[in-house]
């Protein structure tokens, strides 16, 4: 298993399918990286030489924000929205959909499981 940017990638997978296991790199970015470095995307990761793996790692760290740095930036962006108390920040704080989706009938993923509200039995 090759370690690139702190992530263990399987040797038996092709490069274009192994690179998206790194947070911040998707399919098209993986293809762009292979094209920029002149590496065959259908080549398996285990077939790369240590020099090629080093150039791959250097290229990724130089041109892309991945893993911890990217996670930290996303978290800081959300925290900034919550600090300035804008609409999107308030939606994040309340755990509701941020991008304008309706919440009357859906949004179960953001709202979590249903909370049962029981009615109190009154006097008759």
From Swiss-Prot:
Which regions are flagged for Basic residues bias? 101-124
Fetch the PROSITE patterns from UniProt. Answer: RIBOSOMAL_S13_1 (PS00646), RIBOSOMAL_S13_2 (PS50159)
Q: GO molecular-function annotation terms?
A: rRNA binding; structural constituent of ribosome; tRNA binding
Q: Where is this region: Disordered?
A: 95-124
One annotated Gene Ontology cellular component of this protein: small ribosomal subunit
UniProt entry keywords in alphabetical sequence: Ribonucleoprotein, Ribosomal protein, RNA-binding, rRNA-binding, tRNA-binding
BP-aspect Gene Ontology terms: translation
Q: Which residue positions does the secretion signal occupy? A: none
Q: Where are the transmembrane segments?
A: none
| Oligomer and partners | Part of the 30S ribosomal subunit. Forms a loose heterodimer with protein S19. Forms two bridges to the 50S subunit in the 70S ribosome.
UniProt similarity note: Belongs to the universal ribosomal protein uS13 family.
Protein function: Located at the top of the head of the 30S subunit, it contacts several helices of the 16S rRNA. In the 70S ribosome it contacts the 23S rRNA (bridge B1a) and protein L5 of the 50S subunit (bridge B1b), connecting the 2 subunits; these bridges are implicated in subunit movement. Contacts the tRNAs in the A and P-sites.
Q: What is this protein called?
A: Small ribosomal subunit protein uS13
